[in-house]
Amino acid sequence: MLLWGLVTLAAILASEAFLRLPVLGRIAEVSATAQKAGRVLRSSRISDHWKERILPAYALRIGLGSATFFVLLCIALLPVLIAGLLYPPGLLAWSEELMRPLVILVLCAISLGYIWLRTRDATRPARSGASDYSALDRTLHRLALGSPMVGEMAMDIEKGLFLKSAPEDSGRHVFVTGLARAGTTILMREIHATGQFGSLTYADMPFVLAPNLWAKLSSKGAKVGTRAERAHGDGIEVDTQSPEALDEVYWRMADSSAYIGEEGLSPHAPDEEVVAGYRDLIRLVLRKTGKTRYVSKNNNNILRIGPLADAMPEAQFLVPLREPLAHAASLLNQHERFADSDPFVRDYMTWLGHHEFGATHRPFLFDGRPEGDPATLDYWLGTWIAAYRALDAAEAAHGNICFIPYEALSGDPAVWAAVARRIGLEPRPAGELKVVCDKAPGAHDAALAAEAAALHARLKARGLAKLGL
């Protein structure tokens, strides 16, 4: 009886220490530094002289991070040692008991049970946009998405097992991108609903970078599940088979330091190796879905749309264009909606690279950090102008980038038919597109609104022209 009491106490105290100490954070830091060092070492654009200067610094950071991780792990396991000191037969007998399969099983069961109880309150809905994940799901998400090392390992295993049998990359893919709330989700869903494209879906979570392996291990993809309105409160219902903006997980794992900073997200020019890794992920998704073309919606792709359009000339990049005042008002509404998200939701949004609004908001840094207060409409109007000014230049330089006027797409079937033809599909009636009635905008700077309206009119005309309308 004493043995099991000590086992229980050790499991609970060690689990609590593990939850409180930044153990996984140190793993992530070491992994990120190792990835940077590897890219520097492989880069042909960095001279040997600079490699010799920077690599020792990376080695020092990896060494210190590994040592810190080891110390934290030892601290977390101290309760197990203390329990051994309290065990009357002695520490050696205690270590022998810990090797017994039954004791190991009980230790694991108690630890997982305690973690579930400890985090159970976190599963209660927050006022805005909380998730309904169980404690076990949350732990799995933290492991798979919170640690770059785990993500990189998962993708390496996936590529080793499945890449050779994946279809060749035709390049005829479709990438939907733009500021959040522009209509990117609904456009991507209409394209996916044609049945001609493969995409990442909620069933691929949390091992987004290993879709084939996760499909074999998980039952999530075997059934559609219950449809429910997503956290945005915009009437769009999702289930496990719904396509979603998940491939930003790859960019964050492979090249986060190149564009994600404390102040915001900077324009991103991934090198050939990083783009090649992304194309490998596309092939793996196509293998899992049995398709030959890929569709994705990723709002962060506006940061890298020019380099991607150059790297994938056969692909089409569709940029929904929404009337700026209505668009800014929608962004402000979502910012307020997600401002009080619970800690897990904030982590979840960060793991997926979603910093568009809410508690995890980090602006796009096209013209520096946007001026003003995110609680005002003018801030989001300024954000709109900066983003679409950058997209204006990218679209003008690339024939495979096209603006899609959102209001026209929603209200005129001819626009959807033109979009379908542009991406090589036989036009068919849209299933979810519908006219959206925007509310009257709040107080705003009239000059700023006029500047945005002029830019919108110019881009709308160019978009319709490229669609042949």
Where are each of the predicted segments found?
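Long, highly hydrophobic alpha-helical transmembrane signal-anchor segments
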Residues: 1-18, 85-103
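Transmembrane alpha-helical segments and their cytosolic interface motifs
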Residues: 58-86, 98-103
